[in-house]
Curated annotation (Swiss-Prot):
Plays a major role in tight junction-specific obliteration of the intercellular space, through calcium-independent cell-adhesion activity. Residues 1, 97-115, 172-200 are cytoplasmic. It comes from Pongo abelii (Sumatran orangutan). One of its GO terms (molecular function) is structural molecule activity. The lineage of its organism: Eukaryota, Metazoa, Chordata, Craniata, Vertebrata. Interacts with tetraspanin-3/TSPAN3. Interacts with OCLN. It is a multi-pass membrane protein. It is found in: Cell junction, Tight junction; Cell membrane. The chain crosses the membrane at residues 2-22, 76-96, 116-136, 151-171. It comes from the Eukaryota. This is Claudin-11.
């Protein structure tokens, strides 16, 4: 029962984390930047936001964005993390206690769960490296006022995927635990009904 609960917890945690990684990859609010000193930017109300895909500046009510081409490693890591999440989540779906694929043994589910756990940990490592590397590189080029919501979503998503992957790998039981979730039903023998016969 404990192993079953841990399998479900690992799946839910990993799924939420993967969504966070996708949100981080697709949005541009990684860091809030300033082209001048911070007091000057606040006075002029000219703050920018920088992400994987564009560098945007809001000045005098106008929003200007220019595409970025110089952060390809971070972009590649986040795309890899997002792509790795799909097979990992699909594999985890097939090992949930409520899903059974034919007459497969518990060891088959166990192997799929282990593979999903490894993919989730790789996903988390890619996201962690990218979300730490990006603000360090951005700080060298411009003044960073604060971190954006995308970066926080990336950190939280990466940690959740790391926790989910570790739970699946280490705590969700062995091959026997995956086999215990199978239930077999046999057709019961029906007792014959004896109706009273009326003799006239």
């Amino acid at each position: 029962m404990v192993a079953t609960c841990l399998q479900v917890v690992g799946f839910v945690t990993s799924f939420v984390g993967w969504i966070g990684v996708i949100v981080t990859t697709s949005t541009n609010d990684w860091v809030v930047t300033c082209g001048y000193t911070i007091p000057t930017c606040r006075k002029l109300d000219e703050l920018g936001s920088k992400g994987l895909w564009a560098d945007c500046v809001m000045a005098t009510g106008l929003y200007h964005c220019k595409p970025l081409v110089d952060i390809l490693p971070c972009r590649a890591l986040m795309i890899a993390a997002s792509v790795l999440g799909l097979p990992a989540i699909l594999l985890l779906l097939t090992v949930l206690p409520c899903i059974r694929m034919g007459q497969e043994p518990g060891v088959a589910k166990y192997r799929r769960a282990q593979l999903a756990g490894v993919l989730l940990i790789l996903l988390a490592l890619c996201a962690i490296v990218a979300t730490i590397w990006f603000p360090v590189c951005a700080h060298r080029e411009t003044t960073i006022v604060s971190f954006g919501y995308s970066l926080y979503a990336g950190w939280i998503g990466a940690v959740l995927c790391l926790v989910g992957g570790c739970v699946i790998l280490c705590c969700a039981g062995d091959a026997q635990a995956f086999g215990e979730n199978r239930f077999y039903y046999t057709a019961g023998s029906s007792s014959p009904t004896h109706a009273k016969s009326a003799h006239v």
